[in-house]
Every structure is written in structure tokens, then in C-alpha cells.
Amino acid sequence: MSTSGATDGMILVPDPADRDDLRTLLRRILRLDEAAVVRLTSVDEGRMRVWARTPFGALAVRVLRGDCPGGDVVCGADHLLTELDILPRGDADGALDPGMPLLSAWQGLLPPADGFHPVENVPAQVLLDLTESGRTAARENAGPAGLPPSLLDQVALTVRADTDAPVGIDMRTVFSLVMCGFVPERGGKAPEGEPVRVSERGAWLRIDARYGTVYRRTARKRRRYRLGENLPPER
């Protein structure tokens, strides 16, 4: 795919289906945060990741076919959505102007690309049910400052619960995954047997659904010392 001439410095999404997927993602992100920025990074030839930080504190990402200038660009989600809306559907290049560079508006590091270890698969319906319960609780408990942190920080689901290293998934992660549209559903029901995969690497938790992934950085695990074992010296 050429990025020379008229398409220099442009985001290229040539397939109308991928543009539709990008448009849907941007609309969902803007519904959560009208001032959201998105970060596009290259995966390999002809594919890119579209990142957004949700207001719940998790990172959402979807892989689409396309190219981004320099392999890494940050732009306003509303600007990119406008670019998509004015682009003719039959446009062959799918060239989108990223607008003014906004790299300084992106906060935080991106997670590692690989090295995650599988923890457990969870039925997607469980995540949908938790989201509906969370929405009900939010309507009942939201105040002038928005949702109470106690609701968002609540561990909604524990996987690998029968081991000495359980993994807790909070409502921030659940809300981010479902509200970004990553879990397929119709009328609040996921396809029968639809899985969501949970994996981890160090302090990073990763949740993969059919249409996208959510990452959440958790508190680093502390080593547990057995009775009688020497503790490290105080610093």
C-alpha cells in the first residue's frame, strides 16, 4: 500500500468494512468521553491498532486493516470520526487526515505486545450480566461527581479463584470491554458458548473478546513470605 503523494501523512483505511468498524468504535468511545483521543500504531504491513483510554481507566484496542503515518499517531476521536463521515464510501484509498499531532495528549504507557499468559476463559454472557447489574447500581448510586469509585473499583469477577494466585477483574475493566462494543450481543444476550479470554503479564491484565481487547494495569503482586522465612531488610 503506497503512502506517497496525496496520501503522505494520512491514515489509510481502504476497506469500507474496516472504516465502518472504526466509525462504530469511535462513536462508542465518544459516547464515553466526548474529548477522547485515539492512538493508532502499526502492527505489521497493512494492519494497525486503534487505542483509546476509557474514562474507567482501562485501555481499549481494536486491530483493523490500515496504515498510519510513521507507525504511531495520536488524534482527536471526534476529528477522525468527522473525517470518516465526509469520506465517500467508494473512495479507494480511504485517506483520513489525522489533523494536528496530539501525542502530548496521550497519557500513560502502552502494554507489552506479547508475553501474556492465559489464565481462564469466561463466558461472555457473564460480562454482559455484570454490566447490566453495574448500570443498575450506577443509576441508583451516581452523584454529582459521577459514579462512585467504590463501585468502579469493586472486584466483579474472580478467575483462578481456587488457587493461591486468584485474579480479580474490576468493574472498570468490565464496563470498558462491554461499552466499547467488544462483546457480541443482541438484546443483552451473547451467542451461546461465546468466550472471553483472560490473560496476564506482570501487573498487566488483558481481556480478549471477539471484537477487541481491554488492558488494565493492576497493583503489582507482593510476594508472600512463609512463617519463619527471612524478610528482606527495610529500606
What are these regions (language model features)?
Residues 55-56, 65-68, 219-224:
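A short, sequence-level motif marking secondary-structure junctions
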